[in-house]
Amino acid sequence: IYRIMKRSIWALTEQIRHGTFQPAGYEVDFMQVNELNVQNMMLDEEHKMRLVGKIDRMDTRETEDAVYVRIIDYKSGKTTFQLLNLYYGQQLQLVVYLNAAMAQLKKEYPGKEIVPAGIFYYRMDDPMVEADGEDEEKIMEHILSELRLNGLVSLEREAYEQMDVGLQGKSEVIPLTLNKDGSVSKRGTSGVAPVDF
């Protein structure tokens, strides 16, 4: 457990260093945004269901006219984000968290647009990679790539470029790959257009 925690702390720190997003909240309880209606669902005219939970980590990046937000949920198992599961309502956790975070940020930044940048799982792990005579720096790059965030990234250039500044090719941080011409590759990318978020 100690080795996995140590590796995860290193990887999470590196992921933050690669971009300009900063943690804005840890263990953000829905009760902290008690007056929000985003987690309330009307079942019928008389009954309401209230969703409760905690957002493991909420990162933001503020610009002159917008606040970008990404949600990260820590997982110890092999949970992976599947867009089809989201479509069929089987994997709603990250979307519910994003909606709650966006509602909270709208109250905190009333004059700014709140822009979803991504919803991600981070798998707590200490993966083994093949060294094949590579130097330590290359090995660490492989490990970071194995631990990259898993989820859905906004294909808005401003969003993904700020999560992995200087990105060329396959990101070690987010599920996104760029072609040589700088366009987003369909292979190695799990993303949607900003309007679809």
Locations of regions flagged by a protein language model:
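Structural signature of nuclease core domains in nucleic-acid processing machines
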Residues: 1-197
